[in-house]
Amino acid sequence: MMADHKSVTRMLKTARGQIDGILRMVEEDRYCVDISTQLMATQALIARINADVLKAHIEGCVASAVESGDEELKAAKLAEIERVVDKLAK
């Protein structure tokens, strides 16, 4: 993975902390809108992490495949990205 490992790890630990906090909120029967707000914040953070990882993949693995001149490898990497984009669009 070409993404900044420290940054990705830090953000994932932040997301884990947010989820732990949300679990406590549910256990404490906190106000639903407050829980929903925290859930949306966590979803946004996870989406950002995913975008960073995918960007690094495109800049690293996909770019290398394109530059390699290997048409089969290039097609495989582009198909891989298409599948991910399709999943994100759902």
Positions of PLM-derived features:
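Solvent-exposed interaction patches of small proteins and small membrane subunits
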Residues: 1-90
